[in-house]
Amino acid sequence: MVPLWWSILLGVALFVIGAGGVLLRRNILIVLMSLELLLNSVNINFIAFGQYYDDFRGQIFAIFVIAITAAEVAVALGILVALVRNKSTLKVDDVTIMKG
Amino acid sequence: MHQGFFLLFATVSVVTALTLVLARNPVHSALALMACFLQISAIFVMLGAPLLAVIQIFVYVGAIMVLFLFVIMMVDVREAVLQRFMPGGNLPALALLLLLGTEMVVLVLWSDRFIESPPVAERGGDAIRDLSKTLFSDYLLPFEIASVILLAALVGAIVLARKEPG
C-alpha cells in the first residue's frame, strides 16, 4: 500500500507548480491550464483521504469538483474567445479595463 | 511493486506539470497537461478509485483538452510564443509560493498522523455500486445542482462566444 503522505506530498507538489503557473505566467491560456492542475491536485488529496478513512465522500467530492471544473473551463474559454475578438491580446496584464 | 509504480507515476506527473508551466508554446503546454492528467488518472487507479480514473480520462483528456486545443487553434498564439517567461516584479509571488510549499511539506511531515500506512480496506467488488448508491441517495440534491450548473455554463459559453448581432 502507498502511505498517505506520499499522496499528500504529490498533491502539494502539483499545487505549488500550478500556483506558480497562475502567479508567474502572463499568458491567459497557461493560467487556465494551471488552474486545471490546481483542481487536480486537490482531487488527489480528496481521493487519498477517502481511501485512508475508507469513506466514499472523498470520491463523491472529487466527482463534483470535476463537474464544476468542466463548467468553469467552458465559461472561461467563452470569455477568452470574446476577449480575443474584442481586444486581440492574450496577456493578463493587458486586460485591465475594469480597473477604475 | 505498488510503491514503485506510484513513484514512477508521481515523478512523471511532476515533470510534465513543470513542462506545462515552463513551456513557451501553449500547444506544448496543452500536450504536457494531457500527459499529466493521464498520470494522475493512473494514480487514481492506485488509490482505489477506478471510476474516478475513467471519469478523469473522459472529462479532462477527452473534453477539456480538446476545448483548449480548439481555442488555441482559434486564437493567434504566435505573439504569445515570443514573450519572455518571467517578467520582472514577480519575486514576491515566487517567495510566497516557496514559503507556502515549504509550510505545507513541513506540516505534513511534522505530524505523525500521516506516516502510518493506511488500514487495508477489504471491500468487495461492488465498490462502484456502493459509490453510486451513496451518490444518488445522500447526495442527490448536489448532483442535480451540479447538472443545472453545467447547463447554465453551456448556455453561458454559447452566449459569450457568439458574435454580437449587428
Curated annotation (Swiss-Prot), chain A:
GO BP term, example: ATP synthesis coupled electron transport
Q: Which Gene3D superfamilies match?
A: 1.10.287.3510
> Which compartments does it reside in?
Cell inner membrane
* EC numbers for this chain: 7.1.1.-
Q: Which InterPro entries match?
A: NADH_UbQ_OxRdtase_chain4L/K, NUOK/Mnh_C1-like
Q: Which GO terms describe its molecular function?
A: NADH:ubiquinone reductase (non-electrogenic) activity; quinone binding
Membrane topology listed for this record? Multi-pass membrane protein
Q: Which domain of life is it from?
A: Bacteria
Which keywords accompany this UniProt record?
Cell inner membrane, Cell membrane, Membrane, NAD, Plasmid, Quinone, Translocase, Transmembrane, Transmembrane helix, Transport, Ubiquinone
Any stretches that span the bilayer, and where are they?
4-24, 28-48, 60-80
What Pfam families does the record point to? Answer: Oxidored_q2
Q: Which reaction does it catalyse?
A: a quinone + NADH + 5 H(+)(in) = a quinol + NAD(+) + 4 H(+)(out)
An example of a Gene Ontology cellular component annotation for this protein is: NADH dehydrogenase complex
Complexes and interactors? NDH-1 is composed of 14 different subunits. Subunits NuoA, H, J, K, L, M, N constitute the membrane sector of the complex.
Q: Quote the HAMAP family the UniProt record gives.
A: NDH1_NuoK
Q: Which family is it part of?
A: Belongs to the complex I subunit 4L family.
Function field: NDH-1 shuttles electrons from NADH, via FMN and iron-sulfur (Fe-S) centers, to quinones in the respiratory chain. The immediate electron acceptor for the enzyme in this species is believed to be ubiquinone. Couples the redox reaction to proton translocation (for every two electrons transferred, four hydrogen ions are translocated across the cytoplasmic membrane), and thus conserves the redox energy in a proton gradient.
Q: What is this protein called?
A: NADH-quinone oxidoreductase subunit K 2
Q: Which organism is it from?
A: Rhizobium meliloti (strain 1021)
Its taxonomic placement starts with: Bacteria, Pseudomonadati, Pseudomonadota, Alphaproteobacteria, Hyphomicrobiales
